[in-house]
């Protein structure tokens, strides 16, 4: 390419008009067009609109400097420019139309080196065939179906309605259809099927892909164009290990890092998440165990544990039975079974006597094994509920703590009316920030503890956890109750002392956990 104009993404409105088709083959344009569509740069979650990439560091890891993990927040427009730059770099070597190069790069998951290697291995026909495009260096051997004059109507092979020849268009494969059918076909593929880079020619058994210029020329709805643009850019982001979409709803920003790692990044919308897994930042638990925990909470594994802990199987027909009374004399309600057995030992009821319960098989090995299995299930359920309840409690408290900002703002305004400067009252906002950080950390410590085997280091961890939890509750009490009762100086002294202590204990806890990671001190329970 001779100039940057060949990579212009803006769509020329004049190209929307149907041009006269003289019957000659359509030639590929060098311009890669993804539409003159307004890209949404939303303001969500209290974020500020900014047209420039935002850079920053996490600054949240224990003992880490903010420069340790650098990242940049990009808008959708900037992602498009990254795509353009990638295509430009490749086309400086292979000299193909930009739309064709985009399809080639998509086929190789935007791996420029891999594309270059295949491109110069000497078998271009095979490469273009695998990528489902016509080699632009060769003229199509299939003549477009223009045997009739432009004045004569011809039937569309999709809707079978007659239109002038000028109302038809097609790809290099030679298949032509009317403009209306093309538009409907592309809209269905994009909106209903969510297809972007893999839309093929609508002709039967034709796998030639539709290029970006054709899509943008034949679609008139700006919403469909925007959706197509998002699908193309999403493919670019998903294939790039240094890019990650912000997981916040309706946020169109992308975070770019210098190297991929399980580190915290913060989008301009305010969402902080783990770059590795995309979940909310979850220090100190690792991504592997958080995924297992989320799956455990979402699936029916604990329902199965409850069934195992609170029901038993009939020893004869194996139907599940729940005890609904105090008597241990059980009668199976299965009409084809009617077995009578003892709830305690699962043995036949007849040897137990008819006058009073007398379980003479209580110590039998098979009965003991059955009871042990039930006890294990009950213990597993109780253990899960112990950690899950505390995890959910801190999650709920964290939601409530966010409401404190409004209350604190009001108190800060009151303090400023009592001869305190704006800077002097910032300790309240800082305290709420620390409180929310501690809640989040404590929430994920229970996930970490659930999979942690007991040893000397785990005891130290639990002591640190208990200390931080106690300090966090005290700080929360100061902010929720004492903030409206005590004198201004008393409030400031108590709150500052406590949030600094919370910061210190949180740092100690995280440093201990990460030290355990570094020295391989932790042993885990494989669930």
Swiss-Prot record:
Pathway entry: Protein modification; protein ubiquitination
Ligand binding (Zn(2+) 1): 156, 159, 178, 181
Residues involved in Zn(2+) 2 binding: 173, 175, 201, 206
GO cellular component terms given for this protein: cytoplasm; Lewy body; nuclear body; nucleus; ubiquitin ligase complex
Region (Ariadne domain): 378-527
Annotated EC: 2.3.2.31
Subcellular location: Cytoplasm; Nucleus
Residues given in the record as Zn(2+) 6 binding sites: 342, 345, 352, 359
Family under the similarity heading: Belongs to the RBR family. Ariadne subfamily.
Protein name according to UniProt: E3 ubiquitin-protein ligase arih1
Originating organism: Danio rerio
Lineage, top ranks: Eukaryota, Metazoa, Chordata, Craniata, Vertebrata
Annotated gene: arih1
